[in-house]
Amino acid sequence: MTVAVYPGTFDPFTRGHEDLVRRASSIFSELIVGVADSRSKRPFFGLQERIDIAKEVLGHYHNVKVVGFSGLLKDFAREHNARVIVRGLRAVSDFEYEFQMAGMNRYLLPDVETLFLTPSDQYQFISGTFVREIASMGGDVSKFVFPSVEKWLVQKIASGTQHSE
């Protein structure tokens, strides 16, 4: 049984994220989606909101668990007995950062591999930042996020409460 972790901020959880989960969950016996606290990024949604959103989108996957975490990824991976870290690469601009992160993770966790997956063509340009910006200006984000996520975005924007927690 090979366990993999797919860490990220997921702010918000997009169709691109789900695409990677769908594909990674077909490779590994168990996939743990690790929703990172990442307070330094000042997330739009609070940690519990991001966990709840991801659970709504991914609830139909039987071998996928959504778990929040703070601290080092190495500790999270060890806690879940993960052998692989899954990361998405949308563009060449992602590669340098992800390559450095993979090197650091290999140093900290020599027995854990990093697997890079590229999103399906229709999702290569999607980012949480773009989705939040479009939604905050009243634009249509239905092609980028699932209806439940769009609902969360609309409610959050209407409430004016960002960066909770």
Swiss-Prot record:
Report the GO terms under cellular component: cytoplasm
Q: What are the subcellular locations of this protein?
A: Cytoplasm
Under the heading Pfam families, the entry gives: CTP_transf_like
Keywords, A to Z, come to: ATP-binding, Coenzyme A biosynthesis, Cytoplasm, Magnesium, Nucleotide-binding, Nucleotidyltransferase, Transferase
Q: Which InterPro entries match?
A: Cyt_trans-like, PPAT, Rossmann-like_a/b/a_fold
On assembly, the entry states: Homohexamer.
Task: State the protein's name.
Answer: Phosphopantetheine adenylyltransferase
Gene transcribed to yield this protein? coaD
